[in-house]
Amino acid sequence: RNLGLNEAQGKYINFLDSDDYISSNTFRDVYNFFEKHYSEIDVVSIPIYYFGSQKGNHPLNFKFKKTGVADLSKQPEFIQLSGPSSFFKAEAIGDIKFNVKLQTAEDAFFVNQLLLNKLKLGLVKSGSYFYRKFEAKNSLLDYSSKTKGYYISRIKQFHFKLIYCSKKKYGEVLKFIQYVLMYDLQWLFKIKKIDHILSHDEIHELYINLIFILQNIDDDVIYNQKNIQNQLKTHIFFLKYLGNDYLANCDYKYRKQVYEEIIDKLSLNQVFIDIFEIQNDVIYVSGFITTFFNKKGNVFVFVNDKIFETKELEYPQRDRFSLNFEYAFNNDFELYIPITSKNIKIQFKTEVNDFKDLEIKFTRPCRLSNTSKYLLSKNHIAKVKGSTITVKPK
């Protein structure tokens, strides 16, 4: 790409990847948009659509509700990381080059160095970039996540340098840069095990670097991430505020202080139901709660205010790890409830949250759900609302 930049003579530049293609109208529409907004913008973005083994929209396509110029100081969540789905004003590139020390994220670094100049991003809704998804996990991204560079040089050459560029130009890490950093970090945090790639000392260095980056990202940016589960966000907040003390299994009371500040915002007071069935006047319930302080979190079920103890189940595949750190514990349970009265009210509680009612959520296998709130059996109907399941005769 750097060689191509040296040879390019056009007014606008794009870096189309060899496995992908662009719709025929895109070049005309992008050219016309650039000509109309030439002095405002240096970068124009178009939507990404997947084809091949996966079809659908790229997660960042939400910003293409209409064609126009996005002010990144007012819409910092309208981030751009893809180079191939971007078009660049040639004269604005100047001495900016792709960082050859990066195997991945070189696009994102290049794009956002340019965006830091004007803080504006052109959006052309009518354009289309078609990105090929492969059946086998043989992409550069899949390969690179199995190399040391993905965790060491990528952090230093992309995240650190992007922080430096923003601070040098504006004296702070601008909000849209924070969104870029956090969006990119989510893929890192979702990796469970890395001890087969990094040594103990390298993992320690990685966490020191991650803590530094997180401390340059505002809380609302973390909260607003759409593709990170709330349990993992909790771990990220612990890392940000407790740092190495958290990794060293710091005192319960310090973790609890952070936890209590985020518990309502992240809706952590929840029980997840896998199975809810009614057969022969007996209700069978199977589910789990997630705890962050200790491995054991007993679940108690209140049936018409009478306490039922649950039986503990073990599903090791549900263990929650991020980058070799076990950050949360799934406590799986089951119980049988005999139907001995006409109207039954079922609630779930745990001592972990001082016996407050747990909001009820459902996993995919469950016939009840948060959208389908009714379950019919031969003789009964079950209804869920908030923290209560009610079972009545039909």
Predicted regions and their residues:
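Non-catalytic N-terminal targeting/anchoring module and adjacent flexible stem/linker
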Residues: N32, G171-E172, F176-K394
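Catalytic core of nucleotide-sugar-dependent glycosyltransferases
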Residues: Y131-E135, L141-G171, K193-D220
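Nucleotide-sugar donor-binding/catalytic module of glycosyltransferases
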Residues: R1-F160
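Noncatalytic linker/hinge segments flanking ATPase motor cores
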Residues: L81, S86, Y164-E172, K226-I228
